[in-house]
């Protein structure tokens, strides 16, 4: 059995910086045609020059791959700065509530203050897409749900602004997406295939710790159903986020799962298991093209076959290891060729 996926798109990707970027980028740039690149670096991408500099670093270390750049939402994003970014091809704003995830210490404290709403109004006028890490302070399993009132306010106040709930994790958010025409979402591999049991049901597994948290069986099943039917308002976004094992095995574990090396084989396995392989093309590419208005992307064909693939346990960067999701396991699908 074989399947060919055309122009795979990762709508939510972290490729880090410097040596780590060079070590992990190929796992995404080779099989994927394009990816929405997250801006929460150690020095966040808060303006056009730093964003374009990072884009150039990605382009230098890849080929036949389109990084879709995003700006880190901040109070200094004037109308002029947004216009400058838009003229250079930047189409995404990423809003991080302060302190909610990795490198979000510079995030937005009050999501509904006057300055935030002013920036969103300008973003709507210029045709930006707003990507939001939709969590608010509260009990860890309810943080996304607690952000619903903010999402509703945004959706109603800015009806022409496309708003993406990144890495949807709570089944209660599905109704919001279906209620508001301008609300969309991305889904990760880990949120549609894993639950809290994978993180802490046995021994604590730091390599399954991410934000938003993987949640209950009900959440996983409801989100998986969206993916399997390729719901038209949902696109695939891996949120692949590499960290060194030395940091993952520490007293202060950073959030993030490195899934890039297994994405296409694991998705094929999952969709085949549920008799939904015919919908994988839409989930992995077509929906994103429609939602984000993407065209003129690098052409790419990923051919996979139903042959065993033993997942490597680690990727290497200098003298450090990066644990790969499902490392050491055998998947039933294998990436055979990229053209």
Swiss-Prot record:
Residues at which substrate binds: 14-16, 40, 133, 243, 255
Domain of life of the organism encoding this protein: Bacteria
Family that this chain belongs to: Belongs to the metallo-dependent hydrolases superfamily. DHOase family. Class II DHOase subfamily.
Disulfide bond annotation, renumbered to this chain: none
Keywords: Hydrolase, Metal-binding, Pyrimidine biosynthesis, Zinc
Cofactor(s) listed in the protein's UniProt record: Zn(2+)
Binding site for Zn(2+) 2: 94, 133, 167
Family annotation (Gene3D superfamilies): Metal-dependent hydrolases
Entries under NCBIfam families matching the protein: pyrC_dimer (TIGR00856)
Annotated binding of Zn(2+) 1, by residue: 12, 14, 94, 239
EC number from the UniProt entry: 3.5.2.3
Function noted in UniProt: Catalyzes the reversible cyclization of carbamoyl aspartate to dihydroorotate.
Name of the protein in question: Dihydroorotase
Active-site residues, as the UniProt record annotates them: 239
Class in the EC hierarchy, top level: hydrolase
Subunit structure: Homodimer.
Gene Ontology molecular functions: dihydroorotase activity; zinc ion binding
Positions carrying N6-carboxylysine: 94
Reaction it catalyzes: (S)-dihydroorotate + H2O = N-carbamoyl-L-aspartate + H(+)
Organism: Helicobacter pylori (strain HPAG1)
Entry keyword Iron-sulfur: no
Gene field: pyrC
Cofactor note: Binds 2 Zn(2+) ions per subunit.
UniProt pathway: Pyrimidine metabolism; UMP biosynthesis via de novo pathway; (S)-dihydroorotate from bicarbonate: step 3/3
